[in-house]
C-alpha cells in the first residue's frame, strides 16, 4: 500500500517542497508507519510507500483539511 502521509488532527497532508528524494518525507513516513516504509515528495505532499494494508493515509473520512 502507499499514499499521502496525513496529520490525524487536521486531516491535512504533510507538505514538502523539494520534489523527489526528500529526507523529511522519508523520516516522517518511517516515524509514522515503521522502519520498512519509504517516502518521497510528490506533488508537494509526502508520499509514503511500502505500508501495511491497514495504514491510514490521506484523505481521512469525514475530516477535511482546513
Curated annotation (Swiss-Prot):
Family, per entry: Belongs to the long (4 C-C) scorpion toxin superfamily. Sodium channel inhibitor family. Beta subfamily.
A biological process term (GO) from this entry: defense response
Keywords of this entry: Disulfide bond, Ion channel impairing toxin, Neurotoxin, Secreted, Toxin, Voltage-gated sodium channel impairing toxin
Subcellular location, record wording: Secreted
Highest taxon of the lineage: Eukaryota
Name the UniProt record assigns to this protein: Beta-mammal toxin Co1
Main subcellular location of this protein, as a coarse class: secreted
Molecular function via GO: sodium channel inhibitor activity; toxin activity
Pfam families: Toxin_3
Cystine connections: 12-65, 16-41, 25-46, 29-48
GO cellular component: extracellular region
Domain LCN-type CS-alpha/beta intervals: 1-66
Comment, domains: Has the structural arrangement of an alpha-helix connected to antiparallel beta-sheets by disulfide bonds (CS-alpha/beta).
Tissue: Expressed by the venom gland.
InterPro entries according to UniProt: LCN-type_CS_alpha_beta_dom, Scorpion_toxin-like, Scorpion_toxin-like_sf, Scorpion_toxinL, Scorpion_toxinL/defensin
Function comment: Beta toxins bind voltage-independently at site-4 of sodium channels (Nav) and shift the voltage of activation toward more negative potentials thereby affecting sodium channel activation and promoting spontaneous and repetitive firing. This toxin acts on human Nav1.6/SCN8A voltage-gated sodium channels. In vivo, is lethal to mice 40 minutes after intraperitoneal injection at a dose of 5ug. No activity is observed when injected into crickets or woodlice.
Amino acid at each position: 500500500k502507499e499514499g499521502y502521509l496525513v496529520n490525524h488532527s487536521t486531516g491535512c497532508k504533510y507538505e514538502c517542497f523539494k520534489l523527489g528524494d526528500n529526507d523529511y518525507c522519508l523520516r516522517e513516513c518511517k516515524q509514522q508507519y515503521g522502519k520498512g516504509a519509504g517516502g518521497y515528495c510528490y506533488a508537494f505532499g509526502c508520499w509514503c510507500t511500502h505500508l501495511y494494508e491497514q495504514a491510514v493515509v490521506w484523505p481521512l473520512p469525514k475530516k477535511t483539511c482546513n
